[in-house]
């Protein structure tokens, strides 16, 4: 990571959401490079001066997260908002004690972030899930999330009706907390949730989580990518209603010395979504994929990824992460155990693995079950992922 004396601002990018299951296979899919990733290849986004807090964006973020300090005497629909604030605060506190605190304690004890102090996290198939990205990788400066869900845009809470605001807050709260009961975010549910009027994309859930974790907002930029895989056509999110590839959010806590950044963009990560026809009939990758490939020496995280990287037509995202990342934390829905080992990773098994949910019974990995039976790792002190409903959780920590 290139640091600029204390005049710098860090970046954090987010990617995610589960992909289409039927893209065509691309013959030019790259072969995994099993070469060791040297420490000096670790990179991150460049940093710039810590910007001022954007009071308008910060107030909106506190409003949607139900923060008591967000209440303004001139806020319309005060009764609706106060009721929501009380409800969402109670649910958040329960989520903190049941899920967040056990994960934070486990992460601190495990120490993988100290052994691999990467500054960037790649989170494919993430949707709007900043929550788990932050809990498992709290020290990164840049989180890059990718998903199929639309990025979304904002609205003026003073210019919506009581009915519109009430519906928005109800839909937002449901989209945030129902997935934690399941242990994962459902792709189909997110596709429906993020097409409901004012709740129009992942931007809303990311801002909620950012606020609840004590962050303030410096800027939100709507983004596209140029042919080199760099950000282009950036404009303030307040001037956008639709049509952009994604966004980047600059944020920090009061104690942070620099601004971090979360980047989200919507893209189909199947080979058929990543490759396009270039000159002379050759396949080339799209600009967003070029951007993703720039982050060598990163960490990667996969949770409830619907086993997409078990398939040949998701080889680009699998190989890119294996070539770019010296640490991968995933559950069994990420990469196959044999794929990680073939790519040169040492794999530590965590939790327990005895089954898949019925929907993915054809993705059960017998070799992974045998490896767990041999290793006999301790149970994890939290339940996330598809098997949370069975009181069971597994993770694999792959390092090289």
Give the location of each predicted region:
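Bacterial signal peptide processing site
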Residues: 19-21
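C-terminal motif of bacterial Sec signal peptides marking the signal peptidase cleavage site
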Residues: 15-17
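Sec-dependent signal peptide recognition
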Residues: 2-9
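Short helix-loop boundary/capping segments
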Residues: 182-250
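Non-globular targeting/processing and membrane-anchoring segments
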Residues: 30, 37-179, 246-253, 257-400
